């Protein structure tokens, strides 16, 4: 939607037009889809190894989203499984020398807060220890009505953190723009 300008609700209706527009973009986009909890980090690593053998080296990997991956090793507590998944994704980033991005949700205390901090990250706080960079997007009910919100740099291993940015956010077109310098 953010590439073609078609609203998310219209994507299925304009598949042919969208396919043509995407073909004109430089580079290669490879999308691999798995059912929830059917793929693990080993599945992702195996796919990346196959691409590497074909001469395709990823420049960027997006996992949507890590909390829904199947753990390589079953553990008693979900939080330790999640920590392991995030550690494995970090290892993939190192081994393939490219960034790996994923998303996570907040716990209930993160609903409708003005700024989401690492304290509100769902299920396993240890995910935060593994990550090099964490940002959050928060939107109150009023923000949702006004297509606004806040972006907070919660962690930045290699630079400044703690900055809050006002953003424009139109979910229908996946349009997000930073509106100012940090507060």
Identify the meaning behind each predicted range:
Residues 33-152, 158:
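P-loop NTPase motor core
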Residues 2, 6, 134, 156-160:
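Phosphate/oxyanion-binding loops and surfaces in catalytic or ligand/nucleic-acid-binding neighborhoods
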Residues 5, 115-119, 166, 173:
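Generic secondary-structure boundary/loop-capping signal
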